[in-house]
A protein has these predicted regions:
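Enriched but not universal
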Residues: 1-12, 341-352
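Substrate-binding cleft of secreted/luminal carbohydrate-active enzymes
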Residues: 35, 252-350
Length: 352
């Protein structure tokens, strides 16, 4: 392998985007941010997501994943509607608030094809993007055939180790995360190789608990000991689904591989337009599931959503979603009460 090619690195003056905020020991609310324009009816229910400046993402989201780094050959990234300098400035705004901005690699429609020998070139490109835009880490969001296509499973982890070690040498912490669909986390699942290769390097895993229809988890002790299949699309059992699937993953039981609880983040859709299935109708299901996990000594790191843009989108009838996800779960994750929450509760009391 060659060394880091510093001719690819754009020298930047020390600024807020040069920071790499720490998420160690912190609960996180993570949201994906769309790097493409909205269409008239992009949602699963024909709604429309909001185009949002990165710096306008609500502060409840203390980790923002920019979607996506992709392309043939060595994948890359370019802001779709602002200059490189302006994008870096906006990353700096979030960094100055202690918020991390990750670059997400892949996406549902991305064809990523890495070959043996591209470890260093990929590491060089990631470093170039970090130095250009101020990213604080990389999120692996490979889906479908891209997960194990070509040499992706060996080249990508090797490149990320080079990048993380590079920034560690500068006294910085480069974040590595993943957002796999949960069926790929069974004991023989496609993502297990990434977990093993990046053991000791990854910071958190945010499985997608959505778009999986009737897939779920078999719980032998449920149903009075007779066992029960608890499916992702069973809204009546949503709390149990969130609890048992998470418990299975953080303990490595019921056919799933183990991810430490303090590195585990539940991924949920912002609303019914953001995913075909998986939306949580009653938010108390999330709060109760998290409480049950904590009581069992398995408190997790936080929640993730697809996406911040959908969180402020509109329905088919142009009814605003009005940041429902961050309003619901920001206070739950960060342990603070917001003015919006207090106002809503006051209005609720007056209406009684």
């Amino acid at each position: 392998m060659s060394n880091i090619d510093f001719t690819l690195v754009q020298n930047q003056a020390a600024d807020a985007a040069s920071l790499m905020p720490s998420i160690a020991g912190k609960k996180i609310l993570m949201g994906f941010w769309h790097n493409w324009p909205a269409g008239p009816s992009d949602g699963y229910r024909q709604g429309r997501f909001a185009e949002i400046a990165l710096e306008a993402v609500p502060k409840e989201y203390n980790v923002v994943a920019v979607a996506f780094m992709k392309g043939s050959g060595i994948p890359t990234f370019k802001p779709y509607n602002v200059s490189d300098a302006e994008f870096r400035r906006q990353v700096g705004v979030l960094n100055s608030q202690g918020r991390a901005v990750l670059l997400s690699l892949g996406g549902a429609d991305a064809h990523i094809e890495l070959r043996s020998g591209q470890e260093q070139p990929l590491a060089n490109e990631i470093i170039r993007l970090v130095e250009t835009y101020g990213f604080d880490g990389l999120d692996i969001d490979l889906e479908q055939s891209a997960i194990d296509f070509a040499a992706n499973k060996t080249v990508l982890p090797a490149a990320l180790k080079l990048v993380k070690d590079h920034y560690a040498g500068q006294g910085k912490h480069f974040i590595i995360s993943m957002a796999p669909e949960f069926p790929y986390l069974t004991t023989n699942g496609k993502y297990v190789g990434y977990l093993q290769a990046l053991e000791g390097y990854y910071d958190f895993i945010a499985p997608q608990f959505y778009n999986q229809g009737g897939d779920g988890v078999w719980v032998p002790e449920a149903n009075n000991g007779n066992g029960a299949w608890i499916a992702q699309n069973n809204d009546a059992l949503k709390e149990d689904f969130l609890y048992y699937l998470t418990e299975s993953l953080v303990t490595g039981t019921r056919g799933f591989t183990k991810i430490p609880a303090d590195k585990f983040v539940i991924g949920l859709p912002a609303n019914v337009d953001a995913a075909a299935t998986g939306y949580v109708i009653d938010s108390t299901a999330v709060g109760n599931a998290l409480k049950r996990l904590a009581i069992k000594g398995l408190p997790i790191k936080g929640l993730m959503t697809w996406s911040v843009n959908w969180d402020n989108g509109v329905s088919k009838d142009r009814v605003p979603y009005n940041w429902e996800f961050s309003r619901r779960y920001g206070p739950l994750i960060h342990g603070v009460r917001t003015a919006v929450q207090e106002t809503d509760e006051a209005l609720s009391r007056l209406a009684r």
